[in-house]
């Protein structure tokens, strides 16, 4: 009788070993199969390289708008005149389609620099600088008009021109992204 009990214990032990081994092999196989899939979700090297750019502002004259490319999108960098800043700040919030104060769209201490993504918020066209009734941007596709702060004033666009994440590295250099 003790031989039979020993056999049952050995069979159970062998079975447990086989289940554990098979489970381990299956788990390792699953990890080896899923690893490339998960790794492919990471951004590629060229995307990481474009994730942030530095822009020298010293060549942008007062009243001038320059377009740079960031993550495949046009970004408008405008060195606004004191008159345009005063004009943008005088606008009543009730007159705006997407109310946002001019001060919220620029960095404190750098009120003359406006940085916006140059894509119309209606259907994605690229607006023209220093155009339109409000002397800001005019979208030639469907007629949306933005003021000198990039806020939508007229037309089908529902939102203001987006402000990308950016920081001032120095008074004459910014990092976008």
UniProtKB/Swiss-Prot annotation:
The UniProt entry's sequence similarity note says: Belongs to the Rieske iron-sulfur protein family.
Per the record, what are the reactions this protein catalyses?
Answer: a quinol + 2 Fe(III)-[cytochrome c](out) = a quinone + 2 Fe(II)-[cytochrome c](out) + 2 H(+)(out)
MF terms per GO, please?
2 iron, 2 sulfur cluster binding; metal ion binding; ubiquinol-cytochrome-c reductase activity
Signal sequence annotation: none
The cellular component terms of Gene Ontology attached to this UniProt record, alphabetical and capped at eight, are: plasma membrane
Cofactor(s), by name: [2Fe-2S] cluster
Asked whether the UniProt record includes Electron transport among its keywords, one would answer yes
> What quaternary structure, including any partners, is listed in this protein's UniProt entry?
The main subunits of complex b-c1 are: cytochrome b, cytochrome c1 and the Rieske protein.
The membrane spanning regions, by residue number, are 18-38
Source gene?
A: petA
Which protein, by its recorded name, is this?
Ubiquinol-cytochrome c reductase iron-sulfur subunit
Which PROSITE patterns does the protein's record reference? RIESKE (PS51296), TAT (PS51318)
The function of this protein is: Component of the ubiquinol-cytochrome c reductase complex (complex III or cytochrome b-c1 complex), which is a respiratory chain that generates an electrochemical potential coupled to ATP synthesis.
Question: Which Cys-Cys disulphide bridges does the record give?
Answer: 125-141
Q: Which residues bind [2Fe-2S] cluster?
A: 120, 122, 139, 142
How does the cofactor bind to this protein, according to its record? Answer: Binds 1 [2Fe-2S] cluster per subunit.
Keywords from UniProt, A to Z, are:
2Fe-2S, Cell membrane, Disulfide bond, Electron transport, Iron, Iron-sulfur, Membrane, Metal-binding, Translocase, Transmembrane, Transmembrane helix, Transport
Entry's localization field = Cell membrane
